[in-house]
């Protein structure tokens, strides 16, 4: 009886952890909203005069920094704890965007602030909701991982629409410290990102030692079911062919999706205007929002599906479906 109480009694409702995870990921998804700024930054008659390749470099720097920092963040997490790591990530992300707003039309300033500093913040914060979530929900790992990272996709919808159209669009209406549109939005977003991550971090705590959800029994790794787990050290993992196969699947799938995220605004405007469509900017803005919405929905859906059919089959189906859709998209835009 005592053991049962120890396993099921928790200091907080575990669903609050999910809420906190979503708040954090809503902010970290800012990188996916970068495309909403590219048209303004590259407008020849505008304030900034960035080239398309310069905006691509800022976006790429953010993604690369995010990916690299995650490796180190995973190692830091057991040492400093989830709350401290999330707070550090949120403050760095917010600082990067605020400084990006203050550096103005400097490409190198944007590269450093939005790309490097902001990307570092995303990398530090991203690992926390996932790691904490699966500890609280060992019975629903796929679903909870999907929910935890869905905010990353949904967040882009919010930031894209706030900047571009909701309430007249912050890019058109905002002025902070007399700064022009893009810079003002960076400052507003930076403060907002930091506050949201700080709020979410308050519930980023690990469950008690030995915690198990009520009525759940850990699967037996020797049973051959997909829920079983085998632990590897980093060195052991790097010696397995499965690691390199899985890494290859992720990198090629991510490259395809991220290329779409970066160029959907500019490419969409060019393609629509080529076909004589006048309101191309509004249409591509809506397309960006729908892309982000289904990005979030897909994370939840595939996470839940993987709990039912297994991780291997789920990722195989995802990659195959993505390939078919990318080929269909190519056909749509060349006809």
Q: What is the predicted function of each stretch?
A:
Residues 57-75, 289-302:
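Central cavity-lining transmembrane alpha-helices of secondary-active solute carriers
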Residues 190-224:
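C-terminal membrane-cytosol helix-exit motif in multi-pass small-molecule transporters
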